[in-house]
Swiss-Prot record:
This is Lymna-DF-amide 4. It comes from Lymnaea stagnalis. One of its GO terms (cellular component) is extracellular region. One of its GO terms (biological process) is neuropeptide signaling pathway. The modification Phenylalanine amide is found at F13.
Length: 13
């Protein structure tokens, strides 16, 4: 949703 490339750990929020 947000930055699945940069924050692949916090991208599914």
């Amino acid at each position: 949703p947000f930055d699945r490339i940069s924050n692949s750990a916090f991208s599914d929020f």
